[in-house]
A protein has these predicted regions:
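A short beta-strand motif characteristic of beta-propeller blades
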Residues: 24-30, 84-90, 127-138, 188-194, ...
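Structural motif
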Residues: 12-17, 56-76, 116-119, 165-174, ...
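Flexible "stalk/tail and boundary" regions
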Residues: 14-24, 37, 41-47, 74-76, ...
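An edge-strand/N-cap motif at the start of beta-rich repeat modules
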Residues: 1-27
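Conserved beta-strand positions in repeat-built beta-propeller and related beta-rich domains
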Residues: 5-11, 47-58, 66-69, 110-114, ...
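Short loop/turn segments that connect beta-strands within beta-propeller blades
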Residues: 19-23, 78-84, 122-126, 175-180, ...
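Beta-rich, blade/repeat-based domains predominating
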Residues: 1-5, 32-44, 91-107, 137-155, ...
């Protein structure tokens, strides 16, 4: 059965509604702000982050010439059934908003890349709290990107992708609740689950499996990966690569009922990837749609 995705177009910033059946695309939000990156739906409202407007070096082409360290990112909202867009956190409230997720109970979580942190806020804009802050001295190694939450087990997962194509990416886990007497800069419950990854980006937790996109160097980068969620105090098993050949893989949505994962990339593609042992396992991956502009965040409409 055909379902719908929400996908983010980076430049110019738009929220797109995409049919998984025929690839039909239309804009849900025509002006989504500067460089939208992470998106999630909670209670029929779409929420997304923006990275903000970068400072550009005209002598350095591409992403390498874009500096997002200026604090002008935000978190934004739009009701799916129509209405007026609103600011959950206005531009400048965060530094560089990356993947966004929800606990399904009115709290949003996201990675702030140049801000070196994982934060949360209620959907009404109250209760802004940092859960993890990495040392500024870690530089690019401390930049937080992807995020997933497991409210049932009380866990938070996130990626630190490291330098581009650098093979120094990591995935961490910590508690959703702060240990007594500790703070976001110094937590005793942080676990390093995977290290030495090509360049992990967005996460999706589905039951006992953790899925992630990776935009690092081939052969293990520009891939969709999954691995079993490690037991507390243990490291993750080597990931299983489910699909390769993406053009800078970013966004990720998993439809476990249909046995499909959807991946968006900076090449403008949204690809459907059948999951092992699922109802579509006999199929090969296929493109749902190819658009002329880069795509980042992705979520499945409930």
């Amino acid at each position: 059965m055909s379902k719908e995705l929400l996908a983010l177009q980076v430049w110019p910033g738009k929220v797109l509604r995409v049919s998984t059946g025929d690839g039909d695309v239309h804009a849900l939000v025509e002006d989504a702000g500067a460089a939208p990156d992470g998106i999630v739906v909670d209670s029929r409202v779409a929420y997304w982050t923006t990275m903000g407007t970068p400072t550009t070096d005209p002598d350095t082409p591409g992403e390498a010439g874009q500096d997002f360290s200026r604090r002008n990112g935000g978190v934004h909202a739009f009701p799916l059934d129509g209405g007026t867009p609103r600011e959950v956190l206005p531009a400048g409230a965060i530094t560089t908003g990356k993947q966004l997720t929800s606990d399904g109970a009115g709290t949003l979580y996201w990675g702030d890349r140049e801000g070196h942190r994982i934060s949360r806020v209620r959907t009404d804009g109250t209760g802004l709290t940092d859960l993890v802050v990495t040392p500024a001295g870690d530089g690019i190694l401390g930049e937080c990107v992807g995020v997933a939450v497991d409210p049932a087990r009380g866990h938070l997962y996130w990626t630190q992708k490291g330098p581009a194509k650098g093979g120094q990416g990591r995935i961490f886990r910590t508690g959703l609740d702060m240990p007594p007497g500790e703070n976001a800069e110094n937590r005793s419950d942080v676990e390093l689950l995977w290290s030495g990854l090509p360049e992990p980006i967005d996460l999706h937790l589905d039951g006992d499996w953790l899925y992630w996109t990776d935009r690092g160097a081939a052969p293990d980068g520009n891939t969709l990966n999954r691995a079993p969620v490690p037991a507390p105090g243990t490291h993750g098993r080597p990931p299983e690569i489910l699909a390769t050949g993406f053009a800078e893989a970013i966004g990720l949505a998993v439809d476990s009922e249909a046995g499909l994962a959807y991946v968006s990339d900076l090449g403008g593609h949204i690809r459907a990837v059948p999951l092992p042992d699922g109802p579509a396992a006999a199929r090969t991956p296929w493109d749902v749609v190819t658009l002329p502009n880069p795509l980042t965040g992705l979520c499945l409409l409930p």
